[in-house]
Amino acid sequence: MAYTDTNVTGNREDLKQLATVIAATQAPVCGLLPTRQVNNKRPVVLMDSLASPVATGHIEGTATDTGVDKFAAVGEYTGQAQRLVREWQVTKEQEAHNSAVVADKAGASEKALKELMRDKETVVCGDQGKTADVPGTTAGVTAGLGDITNASNTDFAAAYRTPAASIYSGTKADFDDAAFNAVLASMFGQGGEFLDLHLVAGTGLRSHMVVKFTRTAGAASQIDYNMNGTAVIPYTVEMYDSDFGTVKIINGNPACMPSVDRGYVIDPRYLEWGELYGEGSEEYEGRGVGSKGACDLYGTTLSQGPNGLGKVEFSDEA
């Protein structure tokens, strides 16, 4: 296990590099999000939009010095940082044993870090709204994607909320490529730019898409299996090319998604993680018991415009 940096005075080890590796495999949503440093537990994010196009011509001789406020539509979102902690401990007796499961403080710290990253993924993917912290009384809770993409979320100005049309909320049986394309059409309509998106899909949604998107009316007959003359049967959907852009489809961690049927359509330009401090591990005085410590992180989800995001949330979600 390699640490990127060690602060001897504070006895805190920076585990950012290892955390990045873990995120790529066990926390796919966190792995997608850009991270930026914030210095406030309630950072404010600003968002803006362009005025609707007009085709009105200018009349010769009329003045152009009336002035138009170009920042009247600026909206803001206030995040709420959440600290996540995973404690670890290894007794002297455990360290003395030579077993298949190596019990030492490095292994304990790494295992705690993996658990911490799954906790972070669960928070980011959750449906919870933000909760303001009260020191000594209430833990701060950051908003999850399920709440951020709620069409009626009043934490965002109405113009920047995720449109209802960008959320598929019908039954699972009715979700097909036409329904998914309607979600993408709504997202495209927000900015008019060719989309480059990621769909993080629960296992149930992913399996459903394979059946609905690769077979005729859900029947047993296949549409197109043999590609480039190979005999491989690609029973999967990894890329969806639509009229409005490309969607890369990846599996959500089943332990961290709010439902196996849930899916988030993410444009990383409109979602990020605000970090007060990153993943690290501290070791404490053991007083004869052995080695003990904790891994923690402190940050918040932030969105520069949920209107650029989409969601699949079946009405009969498992």
PLM features: residue spans?
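Flexible, glycine/threonine- and acidic-rich loop/arm segments that mediate assembly and lattice contacts
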Residues: 1-318
